[in-house]
């Protein structure tokens, strides 16, 4: 705080990542820091106490992945951090948001500590036993909520990246992966594996981020990650490589369709329809830009695989400064559409 408190990008301060220990001591540290410099927003940490989240008196915002055992606020989880999220367990859809998890209409399932007051927690990539009290299933933070480390969708290695390591750091991990693939007789398929896994990862990131932008009571998100992380056993979780350069999976323009100051969204129940079913969609806009869009027009167009227009309507936007706008409901008769080919 004394060295970097004036830095223009220093606006939020977290005590650490996935901490355990004394809530009283953490709160005391926050109090001391806020008395020293109250210009920033402070929080006890990111995803502290994991299955047993709590809001401290001096928290200005809350960061976590769940609010109780089954009140999940991100799309996917590791097996050691179960239950898993909707992207892993539910049929593909664009209906999911986290508003009902943040403000539930029922008592959620609460994880329970064992008789000796301990619980198994995620610790790195393994498990660890710690002291814990029973989680509060009705926990609803009264401060803004930020969802923690969303994403983490991995791609297959791109072995062409090995050539980029021209300095003291070498891509030994990629070299090992390539050698193993060659030994298995699968090296000729490496590009197909990379491209296919990349398309799946991009689709998962799209749903992960759109679910966040559909959530009107969620204040923000921490993404893991924009770029690959080459340490700790390798995490190829970025749409960019470790050099912050595109992998060729998705363009910046395509990425901004679902992660930008303005994100246009369509809620519909599924991706596959029979010809006797109606296609229904609710069109909405998550908007965090400063420009006044009152009176602007939103045109909704549906095209087939040959780019022939099947549906097109324009809707006026009524805007008075809000971040979430409901624009229109559309209904489309699928019997009018020939079966489409998906490449």
Give short role names for the model-derived ranges.
Residues 1-56:
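Active-site neighborhood of glycoside hydrolase catalytic domains
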């Amino acid at each position: 705080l004394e060295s970097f408190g004036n830095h223009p990008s220093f606006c939020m301060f977290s005590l650490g990542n996935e901490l355990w220990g004394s809530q009283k001591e953490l709160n005391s540290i926050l109090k001391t820091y806020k008395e020293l410099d109250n210009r920033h927003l402070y929080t006890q940490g990111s995803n502290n106490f994991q299955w047993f989240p709590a809001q401290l008196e001096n928290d200005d915002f809350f960061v976590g992945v769940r609010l109780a055992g089954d009140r999940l606020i991100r799309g996917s989880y590791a097996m050691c951090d179960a239950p898993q999220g909707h992207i892993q367990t539910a049929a593909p859809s664009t209906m999911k948001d986290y508003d009902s998890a943040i403000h539930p209409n029922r008592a959620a399932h609460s994880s329970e500590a064992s008789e000796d007051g301990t619980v198994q927690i995620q610790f790195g990539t393994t498990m660890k036993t710690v002291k814990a009290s029973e989680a509060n299933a009705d926990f609803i933070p009264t401060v803004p909520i930020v969802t923690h480390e969303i994403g983490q969708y991995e791609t297959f290695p791109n072995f062409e990246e090995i050539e980029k390591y021209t300095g003291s750091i070498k891509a030994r991990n990629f070299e090992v992966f390539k050698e193993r693939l060659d030994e298995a007789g699968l090296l000729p398929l490496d590009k197909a594996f990379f491209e296919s896994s990349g398309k799946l990862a991009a689709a998962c990131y799209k749903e992960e981020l759109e679910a966040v932008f559909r959530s009107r009571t969620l204040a923000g998100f921490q993404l893991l990650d924009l770029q690959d992380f080459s340490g700790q056993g390798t995490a190829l979780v970025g749409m960019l490589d470790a050099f912050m350069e595109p992998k060729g999976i998705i363009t910046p323009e395509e990425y901004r369709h679902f992660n930008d100051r303005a994100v246009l969204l369509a809620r519909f129940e599924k991706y596959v329809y029979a010809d006797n079913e109606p296609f229904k969609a609710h069109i909405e806009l998550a908007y965090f830009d400063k420009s006044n869009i009152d009176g602007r027009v939103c045109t909704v167009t549906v095209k087939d695989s040959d780019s022939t227009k099947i549906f097109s309507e324009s809707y006026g936007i009524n805007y008075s400064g809000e971040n979430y706008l409901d624009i229109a409901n559309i209904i489309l008769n699928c019997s009018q559409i020939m079966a489409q080919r998906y490449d």
